């Protein structure tokens, strides 16, 4: 045995300090010192189980000891009485045997072929042991699964990949497929289960027993994604379902995977032979199958691009000339000629490589170089993984692990090891390139596009996605891969024609490239895939995004910035047309042009087609809302302007809705006859709250009341004559209907008409005289407060003037200051008790103390308190200009008015942005402390102090 190198002798002193007294004395053999210095995994294991080291020294590992694993397991099984005990013993047995394998491997006591065999046989022993124990337990619990003839049905397990080939890594996942022979039901249990239920439950428990980490670790990481339909498919399939899948839907990569498939355990039983015979025609075609060459060429191109992308010279699996390329070379011949040449049907690589040479498919020299390279790389891979029982194929960058590998591979130093490694990998790459021709040269753009195409088509192995998504955290990377997989599953449920598939396959690599290179890739992708699910069957929209890269770019940036926009686009894909022109997308309609724009838009729709009119109104509103939000996100609209645009848009919609309702009512009943001698409609819509105060948000509803000036004796002049006031009531009802009717484009606005005289108990529409009388004689103080933020948003000039006069008269009434202060304060306290402090350790921007509603109450109180002396205070209905008026009229100091204005606009701005993020209107308790303090000081000054 080669002595430890100088760096490892130094490290041995560190190891000694870790070892407990009995292990640290001079009695340790040179072999033990070498292995404990090389492998932290062995070191940790024998510290926890010193008896294992004694066993290793007295009974060193042998090449053929894998033949005893089953007997040794039977001894361990005597300690098992329940599932928890099974999990514990499996984990301890696996660790004990892995220590023995690591010992033999480090000291080169057995050949590398023996190491691979031992690792694979250990896994098979434990998989079969767990399956058999659980089968008995499940039969006791649910009865024995039987076919129609009453014959017991077993669970068969296909070991895939390196497990199937008897070439398992030291630290490796295991790829499994579960199957059972025939349908039927359980017999002998308390209640009957069909076989599918039985084996699915048993399969779930088997995965848990092997895969679930406990204080003793895990047995193996179990990967079931190679089964038919992958993660979306059943966990366990009947033979009939397997056969149907592979005959009808099996793909080339599944043939590639199935080459190594091996039945675990009793592989010579009747059912095992049946399964094997069923799968063979899928894997090995009877004829020489050159049809597979193109897909093999694609696989080769994938690997080559992966190498170019990252320069993976330090990855002995993925790198140019690495293990994967050797496996690929061998399987090329198996897939093309395996049906005609039984000697090529071996699951293991080295026997197949020998057969390839004997058939003169490769020269003896090339085959020998591949054999030597394979054994060299597999030994290096297993040594690397046995240092920490860690699943890695990347060569270390630290000096200690480099020294360990150089010593174990029998080289003087790291430089000598890497020199030999490069030689072997160069030989592999040469054969690899000669096999189906070198890659055609491709531009950087083509190469870049290809990696995203592979990500979209699920052609990358999980460890291959790192270069593409390297900038993302591990969690985000997993989330992105899950989102892509889930989206593909969703597509499988939809009827997408060949043209749609083609467009999608062209679009998705570009979309993934643009989304996944962002830091917020996972969030953005989740929003966009939700949108795409809604339009995948509508190829026109896919083509729009595919053929107009700028539209795709705008879609991504808007969805990244706002889930609200993403939701709107998902619900109403017609809006995607708005993405085509950035000049209009980020430039909302001029505030005074909304009415004209809407009028022009509605001219496209027949006036007598009510359904299309309703759709057109909603589509116009959504398109304008999108443009406002886009400009808000782009930073071209400050908060005040956002509300201005939203308010002007709402007024344009009110105008159009009243127009439609009026035309429909007049067509049915004629006009009220009091209008014959005058212009106008004798009708007004008053906006309260956010609409009245020019402060609408993205999801604000509309607070409206309806007024008319119809005399008591007026009648309509149509064929269906009705009372004039009844006409206006039906007009108001029609307006409410047009706003609230849900079409495929949703509703227009939520409308709240409860601020009308007598609230919900009052008439929906009120005469101007009755409104004035109510305000003067019946209205509460809070209704006068609401009037501060009220204005006519639609109406005849004379009705508008009448409302303005009533509003001014009410607001300028003399009021006793103390009484008003008490009433306003108590109303606010009631509201706060009802609405505020709902969220522990959060600040509700609108409802909590120091928030927006407090500012609104301060301005309303001051207008009602001082308008009698300063009538100019009644001019505006929005808080910002009211605060300006209070300063100009010497009610409030300018500094305080400006501070409250800043607080108000800051809080409003935050509400807008929370709405864009579809988040509720509350923030952490420590936010906006300065603004809230200013509001509290002003509240105390005006509404508490004498």
Curated annotation (Swiss-Prot):
One of its GO terms (biological process) is regulation of glutamine family amino acid metabolic process. Keywords: ATP-binding, Magnesium, Multifunctional enzyme, Nucleotide-binding, Nucleotidyltransferase, Transferase. GO terms for cellular component: cytosol. Residues 449-946 are annotated as: Adenylyl transferase. It comes from the Bacteria. Its EC number is 2.7.7.89, 2.7.7.42. The keyword Protein biosynthesis does not apply. It catalyses: [glutamine synthetase]-O(4)-(5'-adenylyl)-L-tyrosine + phosphate = [glutamine synthetase]-L-tyrosine + ADP; [glutamine synthetase]-L-tyrosine + ATP = [glutamine synthetase]-O(4)-(5'-adenylyl)-L-tyrosine + diphosphate. Transmembrane segments: none annotated. Its cofactor is Mg(2+). Residues 1-440 are annotated as: Adenylyl removase. It is an enzyme of class 2 (transferase). One of its GO terms (molecular function) is magnesium ion binding. InterPro entries: GlnE, GlnE_rpt_dom, NT_sf, PII_UdlTrfase/GS_AdlTrfase. Belongs to the GlnE family. Involved in the regulation of glutamine synthetase GlnA, a key enzyme in the process to assimilate ammonia. When cellular nitrogen levels are high, the C-terminal adenylyl transferase (AT) inactivates GlnA by covalent transfer of an adenylyl group from ATP to specific tyrosine residue of GlnA, thus reducing its activity. Conversely, when nitrogen levels are low, the N-terminal adenylyl removase (AR) activates GlnA by removing the adenylyl group by phosphorolysis, increasing its activity. This is Bifunctional glutamine synthetase adenylyltransferase/adenylyl-removing enzyme. It comes from Escherichia coli (strain SMS-3-5 / SECEC).
């Amino acid at each position: 045995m080669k002595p430890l190198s100088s760096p490892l002798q130094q490290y041995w002193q560190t190891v000694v300090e870790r070892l407990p007294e009995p292990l640290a004395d001079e009695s340790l053999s040179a072999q033990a010192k070498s292995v404990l210095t090389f492998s932290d995994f062995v070191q940790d294991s024998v510290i926890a189980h010193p008896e294992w080291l004694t066993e290793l020294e007295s009974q060193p590992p042998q090449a053929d000891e894998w033949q005893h694993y089953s007997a040794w397991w039977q001894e361990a099984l005597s300690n098992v009485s329940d599932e928890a005990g099974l999990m514990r013993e499996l984990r301890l047995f696996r660790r004990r045997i892995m220590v023995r394998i690591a010992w033999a491997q480090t000291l080169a006591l057995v050949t590398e072929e023996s190491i691979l065999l031992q690792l694979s046989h250990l896994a098979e022993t434990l998989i079969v042991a767990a399956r058999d124990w659980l089968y008995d337990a499940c039969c006791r619990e649910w009865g024995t699964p039987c076919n129609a003839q009453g014959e017991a049905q077993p669970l068969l397990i296909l070991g895939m990949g390196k497990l199937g080939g008897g070439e398992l890594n030291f630290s490796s996942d295991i790829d499994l497929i579960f199957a059972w022979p025939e349908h039927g039901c359980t017999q002998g249990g308390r209640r009957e289960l069909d076989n599918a239920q039985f084996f699915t439950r048993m399969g779930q428990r088997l995965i848990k027993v092997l895969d679930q980490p406990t204080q003793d670790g895990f047995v193996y990481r179990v990967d079931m994604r190679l089964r038919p339909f992958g993660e979306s498919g059943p966990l366990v399939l009947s033979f009939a379902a397997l056969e149907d899948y592979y005959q009808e839907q099996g793909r080339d990569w599944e043939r590639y995977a199935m080459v190594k498939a091996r039945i675990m355990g009793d592989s010579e039983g009747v059912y095992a032979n049946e399964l094997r015979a069923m799968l063979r025609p899928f894997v090995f075609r009877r004829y020489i199958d050159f049809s597979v060459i193109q897909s093999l060429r694609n696989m080769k191109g994938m690997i080559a691009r992966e190498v170019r992308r990252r320069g993976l010279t330090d990855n002995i699996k993925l790198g140019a000339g690495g293990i994967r390329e050797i496996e690929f070379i061998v399987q090329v011949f198996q897939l093309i000629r395996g049906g005609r040449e039984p000697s090529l049907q071996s699951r293991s690589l080295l026997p197949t490589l020998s057969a390839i040479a004997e058939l003169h498919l490769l020269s003896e020299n090339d085959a020998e170089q591949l054999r030597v390279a394979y054994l060299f790389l597999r030994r290096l891979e297993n040594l690397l993984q046995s240092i920490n029982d860690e699943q890695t194929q990347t060569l270390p960058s630290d000096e200690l692990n480099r020294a360990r590998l150089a010593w174990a591979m029998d080289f003087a130093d790291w430089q000598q090891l890497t020199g030999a490694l490069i030689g072997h990998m160069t030989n592999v790459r040469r054969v690899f390139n000669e096999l189906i021709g070198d890659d055609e040269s491709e531009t950087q753009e083509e190469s870049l596009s290809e990696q995203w195409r592979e990500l979209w088509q699920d052609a990358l192995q999980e460890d291959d996605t790192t270069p593409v998504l390297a900038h993302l955290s591990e969690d985000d990377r997993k989330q992105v891969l899950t989102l892509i997989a889930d989206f593909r599953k969703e597509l499988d449920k939809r009827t997408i024609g060949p043209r749609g598939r083609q467009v999608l396959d062209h679009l998705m690599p570009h979309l993934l490239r643009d989304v996944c290179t962002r830091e917020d890739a996972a969030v953005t992708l989740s929003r966009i895939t939700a949108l795409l699910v809604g339009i995948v069957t509508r190829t026109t929209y896919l083509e729009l995004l595919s053929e107009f890269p700028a539209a795709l770019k705008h879609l991504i940036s808007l969805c990244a910035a706002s889930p609200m926009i993403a939701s709107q686009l998902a619900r109403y894909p017609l809006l995607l047309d708005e993405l085509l022109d950035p000049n209009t997308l980020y430039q909302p309609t001029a505030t005074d042009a909304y009415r004209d724009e809407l009028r022009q838009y509605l001219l496209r729709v027949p006036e007598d087609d009510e359904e299309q009119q309703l759709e057109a109104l909603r589509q116009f509103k959504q398109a304008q809302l999108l443009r406002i939000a886009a400009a808000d996100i782009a930073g071209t609209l400050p908060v005040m302007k956002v509300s201005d645009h939203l308010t002007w848009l709402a007024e344009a919609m009110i105008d159009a809705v009243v127009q439609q309702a009026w035309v429909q009512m007049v067509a049915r009943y004629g006009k009220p006859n009091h209008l014959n001698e005058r212009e106008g409609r004798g009708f007004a819509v008053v906006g309260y709250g956010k609409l009245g105060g020019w402060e609408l948000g993205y999801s604000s509803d509309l607070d409206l009341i309806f007024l008319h000036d119809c005399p008591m004796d007026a009648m309509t002049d149509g064929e269906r004559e009705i009372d004039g006031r009844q006409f206006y009531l039906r007009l108001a009802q029609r307006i409410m209907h047009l706003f609230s009717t849900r079409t495929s484009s949703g509703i227009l606005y939520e409308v709240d008409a409860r601020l009308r005289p007598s609230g919900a108990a009052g008439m929906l529409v009120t005469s101007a005289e009755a409104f004035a009388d109510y305000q003067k004689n019946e209205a509460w103080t809070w209704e006068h407060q609401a009037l501060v933020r009220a204005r006519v948003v639609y109406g005849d000039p004379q009705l508008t003037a009448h409302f303005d006069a009533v509003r001014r008269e009410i607001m300028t009434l003399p009021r006793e200051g103390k009484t008003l202060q008490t009433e306003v304060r108590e109303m606010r306290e009631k509201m706060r008790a009802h609405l505020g402090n709902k969220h522990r350790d959060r600040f509700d921007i609108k409802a909590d103390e120091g928030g927006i509603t407090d500012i609104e109450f301060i301005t309303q109180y001051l207008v009602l308190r001082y308008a009698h002396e300063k009538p100019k205070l009644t001019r505006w209905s929005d808080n910002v200009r009211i605060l300006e008026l209070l300063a100009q009229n010497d009610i409030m100091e300018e500094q305080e008015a400006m501070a409250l204005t800043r607080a108000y606009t800051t809080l409003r701005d935050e509400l807008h942005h929370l709405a864009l993020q579809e988040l509720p209107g509350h923030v952490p308790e420590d936010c906006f402390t300065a603004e809230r303090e200013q509001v509290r000081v002003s509240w105390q000054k005006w509404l508490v102090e004498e």
